């Protein structure tokens, strides 16, 4: 099965977040490659291209470690990126109020409670 570039970018970003969430630092391309399933599903050159694109989109930062090896870190956490994506969807809608109303209607009671709590804190 072939994957689209967007799917590969998401897979690489999720692998990077998983490594960061486990406490890893100075994450190199080989670390990310080892995290992606199934093993051997993408070539190192493909991974480096995807990481470069994610850097261009300002989703990932790269820097040289010891002036030689490249290491990568996400610009936003997984949760921050999810929130940014939701905001982008709302801002792109012709009727954001209706989108929010439909979204809230589909939430579980627990998530609705968390949303109410967040809105109260925002006042």
Q: Where do the protein language model's features map onto the residues?
A:
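Short alpha-helical segments that sit at the start of domains
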Residues: 1-15, 19, 77
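Short acidic, hydrophobic short linear motifs in intrinsically disordered regions
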Residues: 22-35
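Short helix-coil junctions and helix-kink-helix linkers
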Residues: 34-42
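Short, hydrophobic-biased segments on the C-terminal half of alpha helices
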Residues: 48-52
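Glycine-centered, phosphate/nucleic-acid-interacting loop/turn motifs that mediate DNA/RNA or nucleotide
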Residues: 58
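Short beta-strand "wing" residues that participate in macromolecule-binding interfaces
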Residues: 62
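Short, cationic-aromatic polyanion-contact patches
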Residues: 65-85
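Amphipathic alpha-helical dimerization/coiled-coil segments
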Residues: 84-123
């Amino acid at each position: 099965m072939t994957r689209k570039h967007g799917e590969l970018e998401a897979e690489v970003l999720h692998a990077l977040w998983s490594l960061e969430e486990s406490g890893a630092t100075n994450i190199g391309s080989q670390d990310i490659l080892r995290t992606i399933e199934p093993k051997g599903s993408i070539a190192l050159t493909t991974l480096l291209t995807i990481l470069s694109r994610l850097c261009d989109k300002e989703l990932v930062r790269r820097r040289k470690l010891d002036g030689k090896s490249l290491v990568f870190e996400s610009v936003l956490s997984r949760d921050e990126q999810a929130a940014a994506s939701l905001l982008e969807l709302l801002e792109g809608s012709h009727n954001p109020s209706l989108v929010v109303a439909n979204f809230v209607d589909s939430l579980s009671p627990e998530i609705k409670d968390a949303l109410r709590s967040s809105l109260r804190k925002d006042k």
